[in-house]
Amino acid sequence: MTTLMVQGTTSDAGKSTLVTALCRWATRQGVAVVPFKPQNMALNSAVTADGGEIGRAQAVQAQAAFLEPHTDMNPVLLKPNSDTGAQVIIHGRAVTSMNAVAYHDYKAIAMQAVLASHERLSAAYPLVMVEGAGSPAEINLRAGDIANMGFAEAVDCPVLLIADINRGGVFAHLVGTLELLSPSEQARIKGFIINRFRGDIALLQPGLDWLEQRTGKPVVGVLPYVMDLHLEAEDGIDQRQTDKAEQVLKVVVPVLPRISNHTDFDPLRLHPQVDLQFIGPGQAIPPADLIILPGSKSVRSDLAYLRANGWESAIRRHLRYGGKLLGICGGLQMLGEQVHDPLGLEGAPGSSAGLGLLAFETQLEAEKQLRNVRGRLALEDAEVSGYEIHAGVTTGAALEKAAVHLDDGRCDGAQSLDGQIFGTYLHGLFESPAASAALLRWAGLYDVQEVDYHGLRERDIERLADLVEKHLDTGLLRELCGISPCSS
């Protein structure tokens, strides 16, 4: 069994993407590889085959390894529900919410879960490909660390350090990070990878030579900047757009402070006939064909934020003029009359008035609903697959006109009688080509082009593996991964 870890000098250095690439590259060598991230902090999560939730980046990495996502791939998931606190998910199940100070004291327990998952994966797969979190050189977080060097030291694994040259200061990032590590941690760094390089590599070569002489460690390779890579973002909302056709549907998404699973919108961002616009604080909602209320980790506070920005009146005006409104998960709950949180799961206990657009109420309960589902939209009877991640139980007369009929016999969501409003608990709606096309037609787009989002993601994973083979020292990678030359 071999474990190789990728750590980064900063957040968004390219760790998730590199681990995805290495997982697919390893499978090309005939090696059964499994992705692993000890601790992840993200509001984008995926439902696993064993009925839990993990970070979506690990689900993409599982696809790269031709595996079904499993909770052992991300044993500790932190989902922020305030500026200072987060829901703590261990082995796919929410166990508690706590602030940062309390979680610091909880890390020893979390580390037990991390090591147990790693032990199980190590027993089942010859290669475990690990992604760190943030930077290993965060001085204030090093005590009790379970996400970076604390984990690497515990399991005695080598580390590759990646840095993003596109943001500038790449040599300072690499050397500075190395200098802030202990001698034993420095020894674990087996090489550097520079990410997102544009230009002539010959102009960079003197810097690479200096880096190797200064540190005594090799540069494993320089990965180019890839303009049209469309894997799901782990944290920030990706607002890049593809080139659009002449016939375009205008879709607007208000960005809420606790927005969750914003990867729901990636297929729309890539659709050639959709103009997707995210609206931030202080911005007015522009004229649109479709407004989508996204998922939320804190529905009541996000409702207050929506109102404070004047978006409620904009939504009502949008409906008056015939526009369509879609609510997903927390967005569905906002469409109703009341949201009750008697246990204080998402803040102070209490109730908040919803938008009152559909006749139902939602009560938040401690047990979260986690499942992958299949079914058919009420719109056009279109086939859909997706996943549920929610703590709310919704009841009321509006549910009699369901939005989705699930294969397990349940009905999901609701529609307005006039057909302008559609709400569902299902994430991933737009990843199903037929369901996406039906929703876009409902919103006013005709002659819809169906887009194979899963196919696009698979293509990009293959491209990443190609970049590894072309730009990295695969001989050193084989050595670090314990892959013999005859494995492929």
UniProtKB/Swiss-Prot annotation:
Disulfide bonds: none annotated. GO terms for biological process: cobalamin biosynthetic process. Pathway: Cofactor biosynthesis; adenosylcobalamin biosynthesis. The keyword Membrane does not apply. It comes from the Bacteria. Residues 248-435 form the GATase cobBQ-type domain. One of its GO terms (molecular function) is catalytic activity. The active site is at C329, H427. Keywords: Cobalamin biosynthesis, Glutamine amidotransferase. Belongs to the CobB/CobQ family. CobQ subfamily. PANTHER family: COBYRIC ACID SYNTHASE, DETHIOBIOTIN SYNTHETASE. Catalyzes amidations at positions B, D, E, and G on adenosylcobyrinic A,C-diamide. NH(2) groups are provided by glutamine, and one molecule of ATP is hydrogenolyzed for each amidation. This is Cobyric acid synthase. It comes from Pseudomonas fluorescens (strain Pf0-1). The lineage of its organism: Bacteria, Pseudomonadati, Pseudomonadota, Gammaproteobacteria, Pseudomonadales. The gene is cobQ.
